[in-house]
């Protein structure tokens, strides 16, 4: 009798554990870059912060797509060192035209990876919107901690340009941001007449 009860209990535990293991594997497989916590008050999450103290304007720059990704990996892992190196390299290439006149602020963000652009527009939007949430969070941190009287330039290339356009649509109806803005350069992305 005890053996039967023990065997029944053992089988029940094994079944529960195997179900939990299958569930846990599903969770692990669905781990995403968005399981990582991003805190823009930590300078680790900025590629550039206030580089150029004596410059007359502030530049909020959003890097282009640099993560080649893999099938099923549609947003970059912000803590991945290879991603950060590629991100810094691309950012440095783009900033040459701004360096003489601006303090540079460039956040790392969990950008959409190249495979995203092979998805349907609806699917793309999930990953691009997720990337935008990082950019918005970084911009709000930047705006709260920089001099509101300094001229502001927004710039981005490719996906970075898309993020700049989204930022302007989302936040730049507000006077505190409008007053600062002197130029926006969303280069390498479609800008409609309505968006101008």
Feature roles, as predicted:
Residues 52-55, 98-100, 146-147, 175-178:
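Extracellular/periplasmic catalytic domains that process cell-envelope and extracellular macromolecules
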Residues 19-25:
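Sec-dependent signal peptide cleavage junction
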